[in-house]
């Protein structure tokens, strides 16, 4: 049985499911577009708070527009078994996610992995600039389509997951996310754009090694490692890397995965810039910075809430700095050789000693996130709320606090020219004193000319509108139109040719075709009267005059009488031409009287059209010269101008002699 949502989206087979939702292949019946519909699980939809957050975040995700972000076209709610279930209508992507690709095909080379992660970081940067933190960046949320394009999914949905007070925390969605959870999220602190950078680093780690950076028997065990432990450098799992190539991939991955947000790439765009270098096997900025600064011994921070102090940590060996020729480029599509086992060294022994100490004093795995939140951190400064301030005031305030300020500009439909749109990192983020804060300043509205889409199909109009940087309002009106075919645009608001802001919404009115009219019954009427009955309704008569016994001009038949047809439809009408008469009975009339009888019946042919055939012998002298046969027979239809065939009797004596 076909299931249609909102009288528009026809659901097909289920194409995926997760901890909190199920995804169906679907068709947008209005414009014939292939889409995917994600529906929240019914047990989670019972939580009103979660449902509201899901709806709000879906709307936020729908505001994003980037080629590497799976587009959200529509949202709504549908009744399922008496429960109002939210759904999201998304772009349908044909391909595989990175989780399945790595599981089935093995890890990527560092340059290949970097090539994949570049558009991921660009997508994240676009999202962050729109004020949306993904919060659930992981391989399962990154698709590679059938043409090799990269698509990031589920923008904004994870915020609903983090903010929920429902039993959602027990679902597989959280368990799967723990492997890519930033330390600040594990501590229960707010996430910002750098939390997504950390998760992107975890994904990059898995792409080049074939395994996540941390694994454990429970989500808590994994989260604890994100907070307290350093990951094994990814180069330890990659064969055939030169020292320089190993340093390069390690620097990019571990910079993204720095424990403190201030030590990471501060924006996804910064990470993308280093990935560009890594994809070309060029030395990344992170690797260059590592080589240029003096090595510092690693230390392990022991939680402060233990009742008995653990043994002092054993310092790990400082990372070596080497200079060697750059690694030869790896062919696109190739995969590295089998990974070798990591060399753990004294750092691994130190971590093991701490874990054993925790086990001895009975703490085991029963820590809480509150415990993790007490880990020590470096001195930080909070970014003040300067959004909406003039540029000079904002710069002075940040410099007063000791931050380095970088300025960028972009158009904004909502923020006046010269005012701060946002900061990166976000307002309220805690970063190290002296760190760089990027201010995005409004350059005012960016305007575009509204294209004329009247007369186009809805699919064509959608492409024109989106190509102009505008958004199609999903509330599409429908009206009858005698001038525009069904499915084409009748009106648009705002009108074509005007100017509006990029991202503005365009509302369309689409034709459902002409209005319906009821065809009147006109059979038996004179056409001179019936014609106005047809044409006054906007119907078009198609007239055929036919031979008929009915009076000339009388309607014999009309198509569609009593039914409803679209205005402008053709009605076929048959009208009598009055050319038929009933043939009179000419039996035993002479030719003159026969002609008179024909004329009286309405026959208009010349006298010569009364054709005499072979005579009929008769022994009755009285029938001599009279008609004994006629064609057509009496009472049969006869065209007024048609030939009439007759045969006359002729007296013949032989007819009196009986045959022997």
Curated annotation (Swiss-Prot):
Record-annotated active site: 136 (proton acceptor)
SMART domains per the UniProt record, alphabetical: PASTA, S_TKc
Domain PASTA: 377-443, 444-512, 513-577
InterPro entries: Kinase-like_dom_sf, PASTA_dom, Prot_kinase_dom, Protein_kinase_ATP_BS, Ser/Thr_kinase_AS
Organism name: Corynebacterium efficiens (strain DSM 44549 / YS-314 / AJ 12310 / JCM 11189 / NBRC 100395)
Keyword Kinase attributed: yes
Binding site for ATP: 15-23, 38
Keywords, ordered alphabetically: ATP-binding, Kinase, Nucleotide-binding, Repeat, Serine/threonine-protein kinase, Transferase
Family, as annotated: Belongs to the protein kinase superfamily. Ser/Thr protein kinase family.
EC number from the UniProt entry: 2.7.11.1
Keyword ATP-binding: yes
Disulphide-bonded residues: none
Known catalytic reactions: L-seryl-[protein] + ATP = O-phospho-L-seryl-[protein] + ADP + H(+); L-threonyl-[protein] + ATP = O-phospho-L-threonyl-[protein] + ADP + H(+)
Residue ranges occupied by any Protein kinase domain in the UniProt entry: 9-278
First-tier enzyme category under EC: transferase
Domain of life: Bacteria
Protein's recorded name: Probable serine/threonine-protein kinase CE0033
Listed GO MF terms: ATP binding; protein serine kinase activity; protein serine/threonine kinase activity
Annotated region described as Disordered, given as residue ranges: 288-319
């Amino acid at each position: 049985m076909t299931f249609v949502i909102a009288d528009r989206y026809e659901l097909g087979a289920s194409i995926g499911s997760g901890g909190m939702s199920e995804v169906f292949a679907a068709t947008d019946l209005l414009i014939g577009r292939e889409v995917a519909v994600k529906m929240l699980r019914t047990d989670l939809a019972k939580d009103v708070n979660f449902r509201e957050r899901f709806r709000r975040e879906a709307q936020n995700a729908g505001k994003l527009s980037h080629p590497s972000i799976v587009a959200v076209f529509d949202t709504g709610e549908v009744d399922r078994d008496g429960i109002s279930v939210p759904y999201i209508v998304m772009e349908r992507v044909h391909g595989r996610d990175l989780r399945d690709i790595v599981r089935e095909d093995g890890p990527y080379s560092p340059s290949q992995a970097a090539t994949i992660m570049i558009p991921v970081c660009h997508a994240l940067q676009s999202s962050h600039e729109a004020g949306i933190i993904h919060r659930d960046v992981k391989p399962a949320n990154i698709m590679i389509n059938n043409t090799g394009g990269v698509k990031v999914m589920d923008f904004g949905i994870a915020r609903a997951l983090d903010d929920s007070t429902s039993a959602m925390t027990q679902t597989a969605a959280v368990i799967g996310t723990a492997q890519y959870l930033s330390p600040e999220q594990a501590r229960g602190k707010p996430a910002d754009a750098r939390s997504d950078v950390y998760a992107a680093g975890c994904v990059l780690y898995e792409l080049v090694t074939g395994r996540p950076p941390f694994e454990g028997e429970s989500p808590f065990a994994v989260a604890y490692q994100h907070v307290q432990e350093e990951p094994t450098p990814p180069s330890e799992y990659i064969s055939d890397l030169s020292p320089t190539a190993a340093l390069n991939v390690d620097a990019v991955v571990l910079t993204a995965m720095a424990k403190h947000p201030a030590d990471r790439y501060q924006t996804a765009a910064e990470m993308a810039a280093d990935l560009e270098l890594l994809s070309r096997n060029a030395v990344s900025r992170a690797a260059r910075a590592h080589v240029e600064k003096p090595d510092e011994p690693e230390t392990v921070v022991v939680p402060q809430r233990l009742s008995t102090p653990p043994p002092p940590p054993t310092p790990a060996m400082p990372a070596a700095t080497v200079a060697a020729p750059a690694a030869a480029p790896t062919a696109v599509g190739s995969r590295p050789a089998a990974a070798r086992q990591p060399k753990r060294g004294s750092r691994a022994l130190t971590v093991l000693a701490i874990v054993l100490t925790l086990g001895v004093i009975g703490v085991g795995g029963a820590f809480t996130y509150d415990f993790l939140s007490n880990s020590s951190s470096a001195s930080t400064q909070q970014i003040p709320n300067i959004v909406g301030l003039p540029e000079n005031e904002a710069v002075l305030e940040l410099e007063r606090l000791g931050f380095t300020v970088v300025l960028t500009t972009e158009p904004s439909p909502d923020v006046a020219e010269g005012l701060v749109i946002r900061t990166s990192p976000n307002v309220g983020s805690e970063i190290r004193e002296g760190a760089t804060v990027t201010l995005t300043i409004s350059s005012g509205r960016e305007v575009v000319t509204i294209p004329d889409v009247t007369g186009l199909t809805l699919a064509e109009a959608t492409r024109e509108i989106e190509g102009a940087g505008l958004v199609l309002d999903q509330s599409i009106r429908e009206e009858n139109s005698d001038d525009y075919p069904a499915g084409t645009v009748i009106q648009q608001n705002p009108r074509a040719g005007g100017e509006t802001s990029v991202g503005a919404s365009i509302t369309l009115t689409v034709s459902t075709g002409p209005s319906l009219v009821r065809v009147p019954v006109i059979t038996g009427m004179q056409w001179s009267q019936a014609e106005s009955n047809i044409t006054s309704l906007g119907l078009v008569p198609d007239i055929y005059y036919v031979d008929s016994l009915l009076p000339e001009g009388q309607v014999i038949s009309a198509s569609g009488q009593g039914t409803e047809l679209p205005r402008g439809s053709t009605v076929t009408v048959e009208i009598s031409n009055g050319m038929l008469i009933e043939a009179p009975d000419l039996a035993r009339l002479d030719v003159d009287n026969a002609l008179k009888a024909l004329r009286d019946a309405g026959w208009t042919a010349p006298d010569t059209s009364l054709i005499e055939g072979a005579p009929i012998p008769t022994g009755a002298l009285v029938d001599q010269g009279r008609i004994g046969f006629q064609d057509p027979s009496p009472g049969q239809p006869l065209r007024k101008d048609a030939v009439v065939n007759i045969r006359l009797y002729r007296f013949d004596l032989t007819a009196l002699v009986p045959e022997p």
